[in-house]
Amino acid sequence: MAKPATILIKLLSTAGTGFFYVAKKNPRKTTEKLEFRKYDPVVRKHVQFKEAKIK
């Protein structure tokens, strides 16, 4: 069976709340770390989310 092309990553809030989203990423096509501006319900604002490893 072949290795899957996509991996799961964690998008961690930079507000320091510990809130995160889980997303898929193809590491062969997207080599840089992902950054998104998404909603953090803990602080009730849109903040920057950065890629982190799922442990």
Swiss-Prot record:
One Gene Ontology molecular-function label: structural constituent of ribosome
GO BP term, pick one: translation
One GO cellular component term noted in the UniProt record for this chain: cytoplasm
Keyword terms: Ribonucleoprotein, Ribosomal protein
Recorded superkingdom: Bacteria
InterPro entries named in the record: Ribosomal_bL33, Ribosomal_bL33_sf, Ribosomal_zn-bd
One Pfam family linked to the record: Ribosomal_L33
Keyword flag Magnesium: no
Family per record: Belongs to the bacterial ribosomal protein bL33 family.
NCBIfam families: PRK00595.1 (NF001860), rpmG_bact (TIGR01023)
HAMAP family noted in UniProt: Ribosomal_bL33
This protein's name: Large ribosomal subunit protein bL33
Annotated source species: Paramagnetospirillum magneticum (strain ATCC 700264 / AMB-1) (Magnetospirillum magneticum)
Gene behind this protein: rpmG
